[in-house]
Amino acid sequence: ALPLDGDQPADQPAERMQDISPELNPLFHPVKRGCCSPWNCIQLRACPCCPN
């Protein structure tokens, strides 16, 4: 097996989450899944913690 070098999507779960639309991700929860991240504020402007 090849060593994990961090370049594969599976090695970067946090980054891979950003590739999944919150609406399509069954694990998405606006509070527990990092609603306040800049990416989610761009995609989900209704998040209460995002600037208007």
Curated annotation (Swiss-Prot):
Modification Asparagine amide occurs at: 52
Record remark: domains: The cysteine framework is III (CC-C-C-CC).
Disulphide bond pairs: 35-49, 36-47, 41-50
Tissue specificity remark: Expressed by the venom duct.
Family to which the UniProt record says this protein belongs: Belongs to the conotoxin M superfamily.
GO cellular component: extracellular region
Location of 4-hydroxyproline modifications: 38, 48, 51
An MF annotation (GO) of this entry: toxin activity
Organism in which the protein naturally occurs: Conus regius
Superkingdom of source: Eukaryota
Signal peptide: 1
Compartments (UniProt record): Secreted
Name of the protein this chain belongs to: Conotoxin reg3h
Prodomain residues: 2-33
Record keywords, A-Z: Amidation, Cleavage on pair of basic residues, Disulfide bond, Hydroxylation, Secreted, Signal, Toxin
